[in-house]
Amino acid sequence: KEGYLVNSYTGCKFECFKLGDNDYCKRECKQQYGKSSGGYCYAFGCWCTHLYEQAVVWPLPNKTCN
């Protein structure tokens, strides 16, 4: 599974500005989803890879980013 890293309180994606390989996104994805996951910056949001099937990713149901 893959998807955008999301803040469960706000419903917002984690923003990033250095597109492609991005240490911040890698670190945040690993912290949220475990060390087997990876991440990079895609369309100014952290995109996480190698997630477990039940991983919660953006968008969250009934929660908009405000």
Curated annotation (Swiss-Prot):
It comes from the Eukaryota. Pfam families: Toxin_3. InterPro entries: LCN-type_CS_alpha_beta_dom, Scorpion_toxin-like, Scorpion_toxin-like_sf, Scorpion_toxinL, Scorpion_toxinL/defensin. Residues 1-66 form the LCN-type CS-alpha/beta domain. One of its GO terms (biological process) is defense response. Expressed by the venom gland. Transmembrane segments: none annotated. One of its GO terms (cellular component) is extracellular region. It is found in: Secreted. Disulfide bonds join 12-65, 16-41, 25-46, 29-48. The modification Asparagine amide is found at residue 66. One of its GO terms (molecular function) is toxin activity. Keywords: Amidation, Disulfide bond, Ion channel impairing toxin, Neurotoxin, Secreted, Toxin, Voltage-gated sodium channel impairing toxin. Its main location: secreted. Beta toxins bind voltage-independently at site-4 of sodium channels (Nav) and shift the voltage of activation toward more negative potentials thereby affecting sodium channel activation and promoting spontaneous and repetitive firing. Has the structural arrangement of an alpha-helix connected to antiparallel beta-sheets by disulfide bonds (CS-alpha/beta). Belongs to the long (4 C-C) scorpion toxin superfamily. Sodium channel inhibitor family. Beta subfamily. This is Beta-toxin Css6.
